[in-house]
C-alpha cells in the first residue's frame, strides 16, 4: 500500500506475518520500557522538517491501522511513540502518549495501572504544551482504556469530557472526535443508557452525512452503534445500514479485519433480535476460523464479545449440539478474569442449566448472574437476567420481576423489550 511504501522510506517495515509482527511488538515494548517516556523538550522551529514529517506520518498510519488491524497498529504506534519522544515536540509527544494509553489495555487488563500512569504523563505533557484539544484527546483515550477492560461508568465520564473539550477546540481534529464518538456510543450500550444511544446515533449520523464524513457514517451504521436501531425497534433499518456499508467496502481479498468483525457482531445481533437463532449460530461459526486466525481475539473486548455472541447464538438455536457449543463459550469466557466477562459467563451458565432441564437451578444461576452484572456496572444485562428469572419463577413474584424489567426497558426507549432481550 501507499502507507507501507511511505513507512519503508523512513525505515519502518511491517513484518510479513502476524507471528513476526507480535515478536516485533514485544521487542519494541521492551525497548520502550527500558527507554522510558523522558524526552528533551524542543519547539518546532528547532526541529528539521523531515523529522517532524516522519512522526506525523506514523501518527496518521497508526491511528487508522489500529482500528483495522490492531496488531500491526500496535507496532506502528510503538515506532511512532519512540520517534515522538526522540523528537521532543510537546504536542506530538502528548498525542503519542495518549494513543499508547488505549493500546496498553487492548490485550491485557493487567496493564491498566501502567496505562493510568501513562495517561497522567500524557496529561502533564499536554498541559505543558498548552493545547486544549490534546488535553481532551488524553481524556478520551483514558476513557477508551476503561472501555477496553469493561469499566463502563468511568469510560462514560472520561469520553464525554474528552469529547466536550475536543469539540470546543478541535480545529482539524475530526478523526479523533469521530473515533471517540463511536466508542462513546458503544459504551452507552454496556452502560445501559439506551435512550441516549437511540437519540445520539441518528444525530451523529446526520452530522456525519452533512459534512461528508464517510468514516464516521460507516462506523455508526455498521459498527457497535448499529444496535441503536434495534433499541428503536427497527431491525430492517439496522440490517440495511450494515449491508450497505459491507457492499460499499466489500471484501478486497485481504484477511479478516476489524471491519469484518463489526459486520459479524452487528448482523448476529440482528439475527438474534428477529428470532433467527439458527442463522445467528451459523453466521458466527462460519466466521470463527477467520476470526481466530486474524488474531483479533487478542483484543479483550473482541474476545469477550465473540465468545458471548457464540454462546447466546447457540442457546437461541435449535441445533442438537447446541449445549456443547455453549459449554465451549463458557470455557472461553472463564479464561478472561474480568468482572464483565464473569457476568456474561454467568448468563450463559444459567441458559445452559435451563436447557438441561433444571428451572429451579437456572433461577438460582440467574440470581448469581445479576449480582455479577451489577458489580460490573451493566444495568441492562441485570434487567434482562431479572426478566428471565421472572419467566422461570412464574406466579405473582415472577410477574412482578418481568413487569419491573419491562418498565425499565421501556423507560430506556426500548421499542420491543421481548425482542431486545434476545440479544442477551
What feature does the model see in each segment?
Residues 1-75, 106-117, 154, 174-178, ...:
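Amphipathic helix-loop-helix modules that constitute alpha-helical solenoid scaffolds
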Residues 53-68, 78-82, 94-108, 137-148:
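Non-membrane alpha-helical segments in proteins
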Residues 4-15, 81-85, 120-130, 160-171, ...:
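Amphipathic alpha-helical segments of tetratricopeptide repeats
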Residues 68, 87, 107-109, 149, ...:
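Structural motif corresponding to the intra-repeat A-B loop/turn of tetratricopeptide repeats
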Residues 56, 60, 99, 134, ...:
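"A position-specific structural signal for the A-helix of alpha-solenoid helical repeats
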Residues 65, 97, 104-105, 139, ...:
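Residue at a conserved register position within TPR or TPR-like alpha-solenoid repeats
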Residues 322-385:
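Generic long, charged, amphipathic alpha-helical segments
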Residues 107-210:
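Hydrophobic, small-residue-rich alpha-helical packing segments that form membrane-like cores
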